Every structure is written in structure tokens, then in C-alpha cells.
Amino acid sequence: MKKQLLAALIGGSLLAPMAASAADYVIDREGAHASITFKVSHLGYSYVVGRFNDFSGDFSYDAKNPTAAKVNVKVNTLSVDSNHAERDKHIRSGDFLNTAKFAEATFVSTSVEDKGNGDMVITGNFTLNGVTKPLAIQAHAVGEGQDPWGGYRAGFIGTTTFAMKDYGIKMDLGPASANVELDLVVEGVRK
């Protein structure tokens, strides 16, 4: 009896860390359950809004230990879409994203701060236009659970703002238009 109890305790202690580890997810871009949208003030009177149509990524997440989360995202900057072909051509030019030279933007998390109630700050290295700088994303875990197709999903929203000049974007649109606001909607399917 003592041997069985000892074996159960040892076995349980070895399995416990695995049960508490983060699950790995792939961002569900194919099912259109994720989006990366942006807005920039237009002369201080309105906003130009747009999105990136082609991106991919993955993340690890455990609701019991959000600080262990990891996020990796790649964005095809050629896929920028502001609903205006001529403007998109200009955004892809050397004045803005310089997609001929830098066709990809990336975000790789370096830390996650748990703020409670599903809120967190995800800090990482954001590379855009060939420049890499730290960027903090205010994020919220929306929910997670089984889907109707037998998979398991986790969803998040996030926002961040950055100055265009910090990423070597040459075009000066004036002080009212100096920053880009990103809105992120992410739904991942557990691998």
C-alpha cells in the first residue's frame, strides 16, 4: 500500500507541471477569425482606416499562468488595404512601408504582464520598415473553449499605438497624423 501511494505521489508530481503548461495555438486567419486593422488621423478631422489582409502567427497561452504566454506574428506588408488603390500604392512606397525592401513586419513577445481579469500587457520586439523597437500591446483574453468542429480555441483583443517616425517612416503628415493605432483581434486554434 505504501509503495502504491508513493508511486501515485511521484507520478502525480511529475504530471502536474505538464497539466499546468501553456497550450500552443495557431492564429485562425484562414477562417477569418483574426484581424489586424489600423487607423491614422487624417489632418485631425477624421481617420484613414485599413487592414492587413495577409498575416500569420502562433501563440502559447495558459489562463492560469498568463505571464508565460508567447506570441509570434508575421505580417505581409504588401497586403495593406485602406480601401483605396492609389493610397495603398503610396502606403507601400518608400514614403511609408517601403514594401519593395521590407515586405514583412514581425512581432515577437518578450514578456507578458498579468493585470488581472484577463487583462495583460504583452511587450515584444516589433519590426517594421527594417527597424526593430520594443512595443507594448494592451490585451484582453476574451474567452476560450471547445468549438463546434471538435477543436479548442482561445480569443484575444489588443490595441497599441506607435509613432511612424520611430520606424523610419519618412512621410510627415503633420502632428495630428504622426501616430498609428493598431487594433488586433486574435482567435487561435489549439495545435
From Swiss-Prot:
SUPFAM superfamilies assigned: YceI-like (SSF101874)
Subcellular location(s) per record: Periplasm
Assigned keywords, A-Z: Periplasm, Signal
GO cellular component: periplasmic space
Gene3D superfamilies for the chain: Lipid/polyisoprenoid-binding, YceI-like (2.40.128.110)
One protein family per Pfam: YceI
Signal peptide as annotated in the record: 1-22
Membrane spanning stretches: none
Key word Metal-binding present: no
Stored InterPro entries: Lipid/polyisoprenoid-bd_YceI, TTHA0802/YceI-like_sf, UPF0312/YceI
Record bears the keyword Signal: yes
Family the entry assigns: Belongs to the UPF0312 family. Type 1 subfamily.
NCBIfam families: PRK03757.1
Protein name: UPF0312 protein Shewmr4_1178
Species: Shewanella sp. (strain MR-4)
